[in-house]
Structures are given as C-alpha cells and as structure tokens.
Amino acid sequence: MKKTAILLVALLIMVAANAQEKRKVGNFTKLNVKGPFDVTLVSGKGDLTITTSDQDILKSIITEVKDNTLTISFQNSFKWNNKIKYLKVEVPFTALDEILLTGSGSIVSTPTVNSDNLKVTLTGSGDIDLKINSKNTAAALNGSGDLTLSGKTTNLEGAVVGSGDLKAFGLIAENTEITVSGSGDGKVYASENIKARVIGSGDIIYKGNPKKEDTKVSGSGDISKG
C-alpha cells in the first residue's frame, strides 16, 4: 500500500511537471519565433502543441497568425524564471517560404521544407537546422548562433554577420553567393558558380568544384576549398 501511494505521488509530480496545451492556428506560410522556444516542424495540418515544465507560463505564450505569419512569442510583461526547465513547441506545416528565429531558441525540421523561394533568418544565439528543397534560398545569420541547412537548392544567397556559423555543406547548390562579416564561418556548396566575400576575421570554405570562382578577402579571414 505504501509503495502504491509513493508511486501515485511520483506520477502526479511527473504530470504536474509536464504541462501540455494544444492550440488551433490558421493557415500560414511564414514562421516567426521570438524567444527561447524549442520548435520542431512536423508535416501536416492540425493543432500546435506546447509542452513545458512550468504550467504557469502557458498563459503568457502568444501564438497568433496575422498576414499569413505564425508568430510564437511571450507577452511583453513575461519574465523568465529558473523553474522553466524546457519549453517545446511542435508546429505542423504544409508550406513555408520564410522562417525567422530571434533569441536563444531553436527550430528543427525533420521533414523537408519545400519552397520555390525560401528565406531563413537567425538573429541571436539560437540554432536552426533545416532540410530543404528550394529553387532560391536566402540564409541570413546575425549573432552567435548556428544555421544548418541540408538538401537541395538552385541558388543560395548567404550572409553571416557576427560570430555565428552557416553550415551548409549538406545543401547541394548550383550557384552560391556568400558574404561573411565578422568572425563567423560560412561552409557552403556550389557546383556551378560561387561568389564569396570575407570582411573581417571569418572564413569561408566551399565544396563542389564550381566552374566559376569569384572570391575576395578584406581583413584577416580566409576563403578556401574544402
């Protein structure tokens, strides 16, 4: 009897420590995440699911669709506390043409993000890891985070500002144009043409043996073949 009571108490504690809430969202093709949310993209339609270690913060989380953009953020009055051990959001999607992350969170996609024109922007110390299939891809990184891309694209335009890294060896691109400003690194692939510029102490490494190479370094950085 005593063991049963202990197990019951432990189960109640576990349930209390794992608060979950489902929310309906409208159609969207853009995702804008602001804050320390760990977002996982999954295929399909359905409710958005929030899972957290602190049930009290659920009422402070904003999930709204406006102008075809799903924004996930906190209310302005919200203050982070040490009781929050994790904060996860599962987002079903059918089509995306823009993904933005600001802050220390993360965005990960298990399924491939298909788009004619895809724009990915990371600002801050967070991480983005996406598998994509896009005709035109624009990837911008400003801060200390990591932006990882894999899959296929015809044209890649990359920009790194700060100390973060653009990791795109796994993104098979035909034509790549990349600029690194600061101490960060850009790792890209180009099979046809590459235009690479380094301003500062950062590095660009490229693979793919492109037929046309246009490279220039201003500062102590370096551009090399991988």
Regions found by a protein language model. Name each.
Residues 1-226:
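Intrinsically disordered, low-complexity terminal regions
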